[in-house]
Amino acid sequence: MMRLNIAPAPWPGAPVVVLSAGLGGGGGYWLAQRAALEAQYQLVSYDHNGTGENAGPLPADYSMATMAQELLSALQAAGITRFALVGHALGALIGLQLALDRPEAVSALVLVNGWLTLSPHTRRCFLVRERLLHAGGAQAWVEAQPLFLYPAEWMAARLPRLEAEDALAISHFQGKENLLKRLQALKQADFSRRAAAIACPTLIVSAADDLLVPASCSRVLQAAIPGSQRVEMPWGGHACNVTDADTFNTILCDGLAAMLPVAREI
């Protein structure tokens, strides 16, 4: 069973919010959001299967449906039957899959730099990254990754931080085979014919300068999901929740408050 990190509820019956990262898979990706959320919600974070605390070989036919079912099974085993999901990129796709497969379990979605189906531009970016992986291994993959995640000026001002993050990422690399299986599942996912069936409240967040996933993908996503709301950050790159956490956290907290209105027990 996949291991989850479940924070204490701020009060009995507080809404559960699951945080799901992108292709890197690490639950620590959401560190800059935790303080803004933990007073109002019971937070659940996790390392995706095949990464971090849940390291281990993945099956050959690994799919988005499998990723979603793994998370749902772990949540149910922990006694959590209803939750909101905040997902970044691949994590957003897991949220879409869950909202379609198990709509009774998903109370709301926040989709950050996600998509209905992989754009040709994003596919090209991943092709380049795969070639780097095959030619230069984990080090080449990890060292190139920030170029797709962050704005140039933000990176230029934080070179020591990026070097430290690179070293950590290399030491905890999920493995070439697992990465390629997860990437293949991501590339095969296509929600264009099913998105109209998503019934839960949905907030879509994008960054105008995202190099990896064009912001237009989020506009297409909003058009496909009935009643969904969208906020586009003017700056921040693919990892906008990291580079401009203050702006992102305001959007996230306001969005969750609108979608998950609750009366705190006194």
Swiss-Prot record:
Keywords: Hydrolase. It catalyses: carbamate + 2 H(+) = NH4(+) + CO2. Residues 15-239 form the AB hydrolase-1 domain. Pfam families: Abhydrolase_1. One of its GO terms (biological process) is nitrogen utilization. It is an enzyme of class 3 (hydrolase). SUPFAM superfamilies: alpha/beta-Hydrolases (SSF53474). GO terms for molecular function: hydrolase activity, acting on carbon-nitrogen (but not peptide) bonds, in linear amides. Its EC number is 3.5.1.-. Gene3D superfamilies: alpha/beta hydrolase (3.40.50.1820). Involved in pyrimidine catabolism. May facilitate the hydrolysis of carbamate, a reaction that can also occur spontaneously. NCBIfam families: RutD. Belongs to the AB hydrolase superfamily. Hydrolase RutD family. PANTHER family: HYDROLASE ALPHA/BETA FOLD FAMILY (PTHR43194), PEROXISOMAL MEMBRANE PROTEIN LPX1 (PTHR43194:SF2). This is Putative carbamate hydrolase RutD. It comes from Klebsiella variicola (strain At-22). The gene is rutD.
